[in-house]
Amino acid sequence: MQIPTLIDSMANKLHKKPPPLLKLTVIASDAEFHPPPLLGISYEELGSKLVNFATTRNVAMEFRIISSSYSDGLSSLIEQLRIDPFVFNEALVVNCHMMLHYIPDEILTSNLRSVFLKELRDLNPTIVTLIDEDSDFTSTNFISRLRSLYNYMWIPYDTAEMFLTRGSEQRQWYEADISWKIDNVVAKEGAERVERLEPKSR
């Protein structure tokens, strides 16, 4: 969890100053493919825990959940951020952690991934972090996609074998997620294929 560390850092750097306000917005996707939170708790419960923790560190915090869909390029999230009033000295920080590859890029009329990035840039954020896996699952050539999948997926399988006990709940969840990805890349096409990793060269 990175947010408690951020809250601690804010609290330690702002001694004897008015408490800062941290606004955290998360997306709740209605898509069935989106993996469940690793913590096994709802966003509502997570938000409550984070707000309570922030209070103990003298940091004011707002936690908001926005319903948005990857299939339309997270347009409702962008719209909400666009209409939110900004106060003086407020910084917008966007963390795109392991989510960009879920946004479709194969629609003929427009590339929703490019549209999302352009609209995000138009918001003029102070910081944007973009983290995603480096592999090519977007090829229309099935053999090329299968080769990329094989070259990439042995790593998480090997990791599970080394670090997770066979039969453990965590390993079952981990392997189910990997199996779903393999099935999605191999057996799905078009809008049904939501795993669209791209290599960093793109």
Swiss-Prot record:
Record region (VHIID): 1-26
Ranges for domain GRAS: 1-202
Keywords linked to the UniProt accession: Nucleus, Transcription, Transcription regulation
Region (PFYRE) residue spans: 92-184
Family: Belongs to the GRAS family.
PANTHER family reported for this sequence: OSJNBA0084A10.13 PROTEIN-RELATED
Protein name (database record): Putative scarecrow-like protein 16
Organism: Arabidopsis thaliana (Mouse-ear cress)
GN (gene name): SCL16
